[in-house]
Amino acid sequence: MPGGKGKSVGGKAGAKDAAGKTQKSHSAKAGLQFPCGRVKRFLKNNTQNKMRVGAKAAVYVTAVLEYLTAEVLELAGNAAKDLKVKRITPRHLQLAIRGDEELDTLIRATIAFGGVLPRINRALLLKVEQKKKNKSDA
């Protein structure tokens, strides 16, 4: 019954192709968790002059994004673990990013509620140490 709404072959309903295998997404083929299709759509929409975007380019960009996210989350998780808490906050993200030299140069954005890095100027430390020495000598 061609053209009807009966059980017919085709379409994405069963998610199987002609050989009976289930379809795999680009992300699954590349072994990624992030969605390659969505990244490709963003790349196509955000390029000038409606340039074409290859499938491999989208997979590559997705892999880079996934790697950077995993790196930041690992460092932020370590920062949270050091502070003996179980939830990653913007403060932990700030400490993780600013603590790593390469991520610090890559991510120059201001993180909301991230705070500042704990740092005391050397000139101030020298004055405090000199006062302690003077008190101990006297």
Swiss-Prot record:
Phylogenetic classification of the source organism: Eukaryota, Fungi, Dikarya, Ascomycota, Pezizomycotina
Keyword Signal tagged: no
Protein name as catalogued: Histone H2A.Z
Residues annotated as transmembrane: none
A GO CC annotation given for this chain: nucleus
Pfam families per UniProt: Histone, Histone_H2A_C
Native source organism of the sequence: Aspergillus fumigatus (strain ATCC MYA-4609 / CBS 101355 / FGSC A1100 / Af293) (Neosartorya fumigata)
Predominant localisation class: nucleus
Keyword Hydrolase: no
Quaternary structure and interacting proteins, as annotated: The nucleosome is a histone octamer containing two molecules each of H2A, H2B, H3 and H4 assembled in one H3-H4 heterotetramer and two H2A-H2B heterodimers. The octamer wraps approximately 147 bp of DNA. H2A or its variant H2A.Z forms a heterodimer with H2B. H2A.Z associates with the vps72/swc2 subunit of the SWR1 chromatin remodeling complex. Also interacts with rbp1/DNA-directed RNA polymerase II largest subunit.
Matching InterPro entries: Histone-fold, Histone_H2A, Histone_H2A/H2B/H3, Histone_H2A_C
